[in-house]
Swiss-Prot record:
PROSITE patterns: HELICASE_ATP_BIND_1 (PS51192), HELICASE_CTER (PS51194), UVR (PS50151). It comes from the Bacteria. It comes from Onion yellows phytoplasma (strain OY-M). Residues 631-666 form the UVR domain. This is UvrABC system protein B.
């Protein structure tokens, strides 16, 4: 990569507090050849700004991995604001809903894959892949989706189309090439991933765009002009000398490779049928034969089929057990990886491979999929480690994995604002609701915000309803809310649309909310994952960006985890107090700009009520004469279906899906 300064950090702020020494140590360690480091940064010390400075010093492509979509979105917004002239991309799962293919042997129930793709997030994924191949100044903020298989990097590169003015290119040849790149010709519904032909003009909407199209103007067999144009009104925006057009699918492949892949699938099918027949599993042999032959016919005819990802090993011509191609391959050999909230993200990465292994094994054993489907998987942890180059584990509470590696730990405890860690109060659970209400009213008088964390979803729902009845502007942040909607809710909290946010496990790591002056932890003394020392330290830290920040633990005793969390908080607080006294500085309020959320507008309401209940058998559907009532019922069932899929209750999810389809047949959902 060029040594010129590609990354240009733009900010009115200068490193302060503990940031200068942390930046210097981290950069020097990398220059000395160290590959891994820990940045132990207390909440609110500006770890993201420190990382931005590291990126500017190292001048390398950077992958930032967050453990949930909310944090990924927040990091994306912050880094995009700091690097306005560089490419900052967003790569998360594009599924709004995903129910995997499954077979439940106990009831002999096969459940087809069912999913809903968010087109706008898919667009952002394509933009990330294209930027990594086209530029050196790229930062990608990703969820663990980055360790899941995408198309082969070499195939994607070979499928890239370069066009420039003056090129000799027959119009029909370009049409054929676009179809090979998975673009669909559509003269009526012109949208992302399609093209249309108007005389000597071909218009394309690339996979990484939506509002800006590409217009190729021919004069005979020569490209006379290339333009960007506004898809809405058709007006030309700029004339271009050349363009690079990436495939409409990340799973692009060429015809020759596809044919070789089909041969390999046929050979494996033959071997699997022989296996089933030898073991007297004739029904399984018949099922795998019918399914695979149908898929092969579709692959031969149109180059695609339902569940094509299950044949990815063959279509990429990989060997059994070989690591899948992922977004990480698009970074090349020299790049920086930031693992945000590493104490949560590392265990998440470790667990991805095992998550659905048994589900796929069932599909293979009972004749629904070929054994090669097992290679349609995320990276194993050792494969992920092998792909890393320079790594910073970023956390206020590093996990055991990082701490046992015996790598440098760089501490960042002093905040640029010189604000101290919150004071902690322990209060009894008796009359805790009345006490909490009093605290909320006190904080809202001072235009401050409140976070409340509970142990269960039911308790969060009940508490939200209770506070609403008391006229508190409260929102409930729960797992069913879509990733981009969560960012809107957090933004609305900062803007004052809500005074209070209630949640279970979504109010811990990384939420940057300087307006929050109070964190209330209910059932703080209960033992378990949600109340271990790391969780408590992280939760307390949500109030660490506010001068008057404090945490209230409602508990009837002090658990060992509480004791550790309290001691660590006060250890940091003491260091901060001593620094402030020595340097004669005074804590100041943080006036943090409220950034726009990711450039995708949510049409749905930011708050949805949770629906609970079980589906018992084939429940008879009520007739809905009112369209609004019918739509509400469908949405209610969709929520229940998603929840069932999340808990791997595939039978319940399939039953709900059938009920939804039956309702939709009686009238289109608006």
């Amino acid at each position: 990569m060029s040594l010129t300064n590609l990354f240009k950090l733009q900010s009115s702020l200068k490193p302060s507090g503990d940031q200068p020494q942390a930046i210097q140590k981290l950069v020097n360690n990398f220059k000395q050849g160290l590959q891994e480091q820990i940045l132990l940064g207390a909440t609110g010390t500006g770890k993201t700004f420190t990382i931005a400075n590291i990126i500017q010093h190292l001048q390398q492509k950077t992958l930032v991995i967050a453990h949930n979509k909310t944090l990924a979105g927040q990091l994306y917004n912050e880094l995009k604001a700091m690097f306005p002239n560089n490419r900052v991309e967003y790569f998360i799962s594009y599924y709004d809903y995903y129910q995997p293919e499954a077979y439940v042997a106990s009831s002999d129930t096969y459940i087809e894959k069912d999913s809903k793709i968010n087109d706008e997030i898919d667009q952002l994924r394509h933009s990330a892949a294209g930027s990594l191949l086209n530029r050196d100044d790229v930062i990608v903020v990703a969820s663990v989706s980055c360790i899941y298989g995408v198309g082969d990097l070499k195939d994607y590169q070979k499928s890239t189309l370069h066009l420039q003015i003056g090129d000799k290119y027959e119009r029909q040849a370009l049409i054929n090439k676009l179809i090979e790149l998975k673009y669909q010709r559509n003269e009526i519904n012109f949208q992302r991933g399609t093209f249309r032909v108007r005389g000597d003009i071909i218009e394309i909407i690339a996979s990484s765009s939506k509002e800006i199209g590409i217009r190729i103007i021919f004069f005979g067999n020569e490209i006379e002009n290339i333009q960007n144009f506004d898809v809405l009104n058709g007006k030309a925006i700029t004339n271009l000398k050349l363009i690079t057009l990436f495939p409409a699918s990340l799973y692009a492949t060429n015809t020759q490779k596809l044919q070789e892949g089909i041969k390999r699938i046929r050979q494996e099918l033959k071997e699997q049928i022989n296996h089933f027949e030898k073991t007297n599993q004739l029904l399984a042999a018949q099922k795998i034969k019918m399914r695979t032959l149908h898929d092969l016919e579709m692959l031969e005819q149109i180059g695609n089929c339902n569940g094509v990802e299950n044949y990815s090993r063959h279509l990429a011509l990989k060997e059994k057990g070989e690591a899948p191609s992922t977004l990480i391959d698009f970074f090349g050999n020299e790049f920086l990886t930031i693992i945000d909230e590493s104490h949560v993200t590392i265990p998440q990465i470790k667990g991805m491979y095992f998550g659905d292994f048994s589900r796929k094994t069932n599909l293979v054993n009972f004749g629904f999929r070929l054994p090669s489907a097992l290679d349609n998987r995320p990276l194993k942890f050792h494969e992920f480690q092998a792909k890393m180059n320079k790594v910073i584990y970023l956390s206020a509470t590093p996990g055991n994995y990082e701490l046992t590696k015996k790598i440098p730990i760089v501490e960042q405890i002093i905040r640029p604002t010189f604000v101290l860690d919150p004071e902690i109060e322990i209060r009894p659970t008796h009359n805790q609701m009345d006490d909490l209400y009093f605290e909320i009213k006190h904080q809202t008088k001072n235009n401050q915000r409140i976070l409340i964390t509970t142990l269960t979803i039911n308790m969060s729902e009940d508490l939200t309803a209770y506070l609403k009845n008391l006229c508190i502007k409260v929102a409930y942040l729960h797992s069913e809310i879509k990733s981009l909607q969560r960012l809107e809710i957090l933004k609305d909290l900062r803007l004052g649309k809500y005074d209070c946010l209630v949640g279970v496990n979504l109010l811990r790591e990384g939420l940057d909310l300087p307006e929050v002056a109070l964190v209330a932890i209910l059932d703080a003394d209960k033992q378990g994952f949600l109340r271990n020392e790391r969780s408590l330290i992280q939760t307390i830290g949500r109030a660490a960006r506010n001068i008057t920040g404090k945490a209230i633990m409602y508990a009837d005793c002090i658990s060992p985890a509480m004791q550790i969390a309290i001691e660590e908080t006060y250890r940091r607080r003491k260091i901060q107090q001593q620094y402030n006294e020595t340097m004669k500085v005074t804590p100041t309020a943080l006036n943090k700009t409220i950034l726009e959320t990711i450039s995708i507008k949510q049409k749905e309401s930011a708050q949805n009520e949770n629906e609970n209940g079980k589906v018992k058998g084939q429940k008879k559907l009520q007739t809905h004469t009112n369209i609004t009532a019918k739509n509400k019922e469908i949405k209610r069932l969709q929520k229940m279906m998603k929840e069932a899929a999340k808990t791997l209750d595939f039978e319940k999810a399939a039953t709900l899906r059938d009920l939804i389809l039956e309702l939709e047949k009686k009238g289109k959902l608006k």
